[in-house]
Regions:
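A contiguous loop/helix-start segment that scaffolds small-molecule binding in enzyme catalytic cores
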Residues: 7-13, 25, 29-31, 68, ...
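Short glycine-cluster motifs
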Residues: 4-75
């Protein structure tokens, strides 16, 4: 599609949620562009780990809590070997699991079987940075003792000592007096209907123009 549209239009934008450097197809897409001598520019975004960290008040690194973080994904058993599970269980810093909430029961069990401490805390952030954001807190032990849960997609898991800071510094989903809330979702603004009407109008114009070109 990139090659096709690059041949049709002067400028083409390929949008992706988060940041294209994390868990994306950027390598394949850049290779395709390079093979076809198509010039490109990469604009960085905010990856889910950073967004969820900011909107929960849970830093990925913090003095006396974590000196580093590992970003992983776990969508099937073959992705992580038993040897790697042992390394993760012994890892004393922050673990962040992308696109893995549906397999969280397996993740917790693998870590416990590999010798991880039962009291390691973690949070599951559902729909991070949106007005629908919800956060659920667990420890490895407490999660293993409850029935399997369903989480709203997309969700991200932040695991390690830093997760214990959520209760203290959570500002988005709380009545915390220090929560300034300078930024509000557009739904709360009086101009939302005007913006919605403008977008609908432009979409309608685009559809009509496309129909004319096809006919």
């Amino acid at each position: 599609m990139l090659v096709k549209f690059a041949g049709l239009y002067e400028r083409v934008i390929r949008l992706k949620g988060g940041d294209i450097a994390f868990f994306s197809n950027i390598y394949d897409e850049l290779q395709t562009l390079a093979d076809n001598n198509i010039a490109y520019e990469i604009v960085p975004g905010i990856t889910a780990a950073s967004g969820a960290s900011a909107y929960t008040g849970v830093p990925l690194t913090a003095r006396d809590h974590s000196r580093g973080a590992q970003l992983l994904t776990y969508y099937r058993d073959t992705v992580i070997s038993n040897e790697v599970w042992k390394q993760l269980a012994a890892f004393e810093e922050t673990l962040v699991f992308y696109m893995s909430s549906n397999n969280l029961t397996s993740i917790v069990q693998h870590l416990l079987n590999a010798g991880a401490e039962k009291n390691i805390p973690f949070i599951v952030v559902e729909q991070a940075t949106t007005p629908n954001q919800k956060v659920k807190s667990f420890t490895l032990q407490s999660f293993s003792e409850v029935p399997e849960q369903d989480f709203t997609s997309p969700s991200i898991v932040i695991m390690g000592k830093v997760a214990s800071l959520y209760k203290q510094f959570n500002w988005f989903n709380s009545d915390n007096a220090t929560a300034a809330n300078y930024f509000r979702s557009v739904e709360e603004e009086t101009g939302y209907l005007k913006i919605q009407s403008f977008i609908q109008q432009k979409n309608s114009e685009h559809v009509n123009r496309t129909k004319t070109q096809i006919s």
